[in-house]
UniProtKB/Swiss-Prot annotation:
Protein name: Large ribosomal subunit protein uL1
Self-association and partners: Part of the 50S ribosomal subunit.
One Gene Ontology cellular component: large ribosomal subunit
Keywords: Repressor, Ribonucleoprotein, Ribosomal protein, RNA-binding, rRNA-binding, Translation regulation, tRNA-binding
GO terms, molecular function: rRNA binding; structural constituent of ribosome; tRNA binding
One record GO biological process: regulation of translation
Pfam families for this protein: Ribosomal_L1 (PF00687)
Lineage, broadest ranks: Bacteria, Pseudomonadati, Pseudomonadota, Alphaproteobacteria, Rickettsiales
Source species: Rickettsia rickettsii (strain Sheila Smith)
Length: 239
């Protein structure tokens, strides 16, 4: 009896996937509004998926003058709970705690990192402790957690840095082949909020275009949801 039920569930699940995929046409280009609507209607998973963006840039990320990297404060947030660690001198620890940091300290946090215990999503540091943090740069760097003044995570303004991290600040960085990938909120967000996040992110990446770049900068753009369909964006619809 249980086998029949399992088969019925699998058939039902497969049907939902097929029906969802039929709502998105692989040979069609969508504007942002239509893309969000399609992805919502095509989602079949039982959890709240993330809206993801992939941008293909006409850069060669092997050249230092063509690096595209930065942060964006998403107007509607990410929908995720962000754990923030602040590494600073003892006299500023209380300030960091009051501002909402989840982990605060100096050598204690660095020792935990060395031991492989990384229980945070963002690491913020004051300039006066960066020399000490250098000892774990090879651990934090590959994970995208190394504090960086260009990203606002090496700063004297601890309070504002924590606020930005908690409220929906997203880092972007062009990887090999000029690909940028980021999550921009939950599919349960209103269409308006998702579009606000999308427009803010796209605008930031476009503004980050390397000054000396020749040729087309934005080559292709795709939106998708976690375990869901993917749609290609009509670049002529991007203002």
């Amino acid at each position: 009896m249980s086998n029949k039920k399992d088969i019925a569930v699998k058939i039902s699940g497969g049907k939902k996937i097929r029906e969802a995929r039929e709502k998105v046409k692989s040979d069609t280009l969508y504007n942002l509004t239509n893309a969000v609507e399609r992805l919502k209607s095509a989602s079949y998973v039982k959890f709240d998926p993330t809206l993801e963006i992939v941008m293909k840039l006409g850069i060669d990320s092997r050249h230092s003058d063509q690096m595209v990297r930065g942060v964006v404060n998403l107007p509607a947030g990410t929908g995720k709970t962000v754990r923030v660690a602040v590494i600073c001198k003892e006299e500023r620890e209380e300030e960091a705690k009051s501002a909402g940091a989840d982990l605060v300290g100096s050598t204690n946090i660095i020792d935990e990192i060395k031991a492989g215990k990384i229980n945070f999503d963002v690491c913020i540091a004051t300039p006066d402790v960066m020399a000490a943090i250098g000892s774990v740069a090879r651990i934090l760097g590959p994970k995208g957690l190394m504090p960086n003044p260009k990203l606002g995570t090496v700063t004297l303004d601890i309070k504002n840095a924590i606020k930005n991290a908690k409220s929906g600040q997203v880092e972007y960085r062009a990887e090999k082949a000029g690909i940028i990938h980021a999550g921009l909120g939950k599919l349960s967000f209103s269409d308006q909020d998702l579009l606000k996040n999308l427009n803010a992110f796209i605008e930031a990446v476009i503004k980050a275009k390397p000054a000396g770049l020749k040729g087309s900068y934005l080559k292709a753009m795709y939106l998708s949801s976690t375990m869901g369909a993917s749609v290609q964006i009509d670049l002529t619809s991007i203002a």
